[in-house]
């Protein structure tokens, strides 16, 4: 790009940095980090491992918030200095380096800005993501497998760990259901944008007549909750446990021992399953976390409905409502029905490029809370 254009881009980035700086108390961040590090250096810190891990995680979050801002601030300062040098004496190699660094810093700023939109209580938690095909037979189960691939690709691109806790293959193709644990900081905050019904339109490869088909898949997303984060009483007599032989995605890594666990919460009928661990105990522990997450979600839904009734507002019920359409025929377009964001890059979306949709959703969600 021309030097004048580069300077305009740098100026825009500096404005964003100044805006972030006005809302960021670096001294308070440093004080909180120092306080936590002092606790970590005390004898007996690991006596309560759960509490210790919580302090470590909190410290890492604070450091990440501080260090990512300082890194961005330094990058923009370096870009400004490089542009000044080029204004005095043009250098082709330095100019190319400036263009590359501007592009990288713009992406880093977009990522930082996205993180600032995560304001909900459990946004920093791991996510539990469930995939359930709707009616439509093979076409729907195949669409479910496409979404499974899309979310795993997205998670891998963000360095999140993916654990497949449950995976049931379709009769002909695709999957009947799947449950993923997306492990990493802010996983739930990003993925809560995906909860709802995803509609898919294409010429079906399973239809010999080559007709256009519409299929639906429901995605449910919940935060993974630790025992100290929420109190949900689950009576032992209310839970039925079944064990079975585990098998990985597509029938891989089949276990000859019944280590997989399925829990049924009798009062609500909620069913969860885990087959990712090598022992029944490990899978039961994960399944219990998933059950708590589902019970929490159920209670939150009730509270939101009651609040909406009292305030006279219309509740946005994501589960059971269509949130996004993916059209591959007669044209190619993916459109979010809440934020209005759309793109013709269907291949990129199916390869996991969901960040523009997530960003648009978070901004839309914030605007719903603060309409002015």
Swiss-Prot record:
Compartments where located: Cytoplasm
Annotated GO MF terms: translation release factor activity, codon specific
Keyword Oxidoreductase annotated: no
Record key words, sorted: Cytoplasm, Methylation, Protein biosynthesis
Modification type N5-methylglutamine: residues: 252
Modification after translation, per record: Methylated by PrmC. Methylation increases the termination efficiency of RF2.
UniProt xrefs under Pfam families: PCRF, RF-1
GO cellular component, one term: cytoplasm
InterPro entries reported in the protein's UniProt record: PCRF, Pep_chain_release_fac_I, Pep_chain_release_fac_I_sf, PrfB
PROSITE patterns according to UniProt: RF_PROK_I
Family: Belongs to the prokaryotic/mitochondrial release factor family.
PANTHER family: CLASS I PEPTIDE CHAIN RELEASE FACTOR, PEPTIDE CHAIN RELEASE FACTOR 2
Role this protein plays: Peptide chain release factor 2 directs the termination of translation in response to the peptide chain termination codons UGA and UAA.
Name of this chain's protein: Peptide chain release factor 2
Organism per entry: Oenococcus oeni (strain ATCC BAA-331 / PSU-1)
């Amino acid at each position: 790009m021309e030097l004048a254009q580069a300077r305009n881009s740098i100026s825009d980035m500096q404005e964003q940095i100044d805006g972030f700086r006005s809302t960021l108390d670096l001294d308070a961040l440093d004080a909180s980090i120092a306080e936590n590090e002092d606790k970590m250096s005390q004898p007996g810190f690991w006596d309560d491992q759960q509490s210790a891990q919580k302090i470590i995680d909190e410290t890492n979050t604070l450091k990440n918030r501080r260090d990512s801002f300082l890194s961005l601030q330094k990058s923009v300062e370096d870009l400004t200095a490089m542009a000044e040098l080029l204004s005095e004496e043009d250098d082709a190699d330095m100019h190319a380096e400036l263009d590359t660094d501007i592009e990288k810093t713009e992406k880093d700023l977009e990522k930082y800005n996205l993180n600032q939109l995560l304001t909900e209580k459990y946004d920093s938690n791991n996510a539990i993501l469930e995939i359930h095909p709707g009616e439509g037979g093979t076409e729907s189960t195949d669409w479910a497998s496409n979404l499974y691939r899309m979310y795993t690709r997205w998670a891998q691109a963000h360095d999140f760990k993916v654990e497949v806790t449950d995976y049931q293959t379709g009769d002909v193709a695709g999957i009947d259901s799947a449950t993923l644990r997306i492990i990493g900081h802010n996983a739930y905050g990003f993925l809560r944008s995906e909860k709802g019904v995803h509609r898919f339109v294409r010429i079906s490869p399973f239809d010999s007549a080559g007709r256009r088909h519409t299929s639906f898949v429901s995605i449910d997303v919940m935060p993974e909750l630790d025992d100290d984060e929420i109190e949900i009483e689950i009576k032992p007599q209310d839970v039925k446990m079944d064990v079975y032989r585990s098998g990985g995605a597509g029938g891989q890594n089949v276990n000859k021992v019944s280590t997989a666990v399925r829990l049924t919460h009798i009062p609500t009928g909620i069913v969860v399953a885990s087959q990712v661990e090598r022992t029944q105990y490990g899978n039961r522990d994960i399944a219990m976390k998933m059950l708590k997450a589902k019970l929490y979600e159920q209670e939150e839904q009730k509270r939101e409905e009651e609040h909406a009734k009292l305030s006279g507002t219309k509740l946005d019920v994501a589960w059971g409502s269509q949130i996004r359409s993916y059209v591959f025929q007669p044209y190619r377009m993916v459109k979010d029905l809440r934020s209005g964001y759309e793109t013709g890059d269907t291949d990129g979306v199916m390869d996991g490029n969901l960040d523009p949709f997530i960003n648009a959703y978070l901004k839309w969600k914030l605007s719903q809370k603060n309409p002015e």
